Each structure stands twice: as C-alpha cells, then as structure tokens.
A protein has these predicted regions:
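Small cysteine-rich, disulfide-bonded extracellular modules of the LU/uPAR three-finger superfamily
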Residues: 1-78, 83-134
Length: 134
C-alpha cells in the first residue's frame, strides 16, 4: 500500500470475502479460494472510510456496507481491492488482506457460515495505520 496513502488507496474499493486457504500475503494469487461475497457501500458503490483520526481509518457510522452472498461456505479471509482486481499475483495492485471470524479477527461478522442469496452486512470496521520508523 505504498504511494498516496492508505485512505485514498482503499476508498472506492470493495471488500471481497472468501472461503478457503488465506494466501500468505495480499500480493499472492487467490489460488483455489472461493468468492462468497463482495461488500460495497449500499451494495453497489465503492466503500469510503472516514478521515483518519489518530492513525485509524473507520467505516462511517451511517454508511451501509453490505453484499449478497454469491456462494455458500465458511468465510476465512477478506481482501479490500479495486473492482478491476483479478485476484492474480501482483505486487502493484492495491490490496489489504485479513482474517474473518466472529470474534478477534480482522473482520468480525455475525456468522462465518455464509449462505448463497443472503446478505452479509459489515456493521463496523476499522484499520489501524501506524507510522513506519526509518
């Protein structure tokens, strides 16, 4: 996520939730992971974060981040990507990857058992941005 900053890089993206083995890094190919859900602002537009406060990007309180599940499975990881991202290995595609769970994960959902055709809302989400020391 080097470049103009994390907020402008992630704004306008989408959260893709997958089942399967989480790649070692966000630069790696998705491999055999299965896309379960794509979460967007109001289900259709790119997500946008509030301005950073004390190094934390936060989902805006009134924003509705949701998506309809396109497959059934157990959610294991997510990526925040731009809509054109193919999931192939890349060191230049802006991506953020993390774990999915119901507690103590990078993205906590009400359930990790997603069912095709049902919605998956993201009710709260934040990213800690820490300064890198020289």
């Amino acid at each position: 996520l080097a470049g103009p900053g994390v907020k402008p890089t992630l704004d306008g993206g989408e959260i893709r939730i997958y089942s399967g083995i989480r790649p070692a890094t966000a630069d790696d190919s998705l491999g055999a992971a299965v896309l379960l859900c794509t979460v967007r602002l109001n289900g259709t537009n790119g997500i946008v974060f509030d301005d950073s406060t004390a190094g934390i990007l936060v989902k805006p309180t009134g924003a509705t981040w949701t998506g309809n599940n396109v497959a059934s499975g157990t959610a294991t990881f997510f990526r925040i990507v731009k809509s054109a991202d193919t999931g192939a290995a890349s060191t230049s595609a802006p991506r953020l990857q993390g774990t999915v769970g119901v507690v103590a994960a990078d993205l906590n959902l009400d359930t990790v058992a997603l069912t095709s055709g049902l919605p998956t809302p993201v009710t709260s989400f934040n990213i800690g941005i820490y300064a890198q020391l020289p």
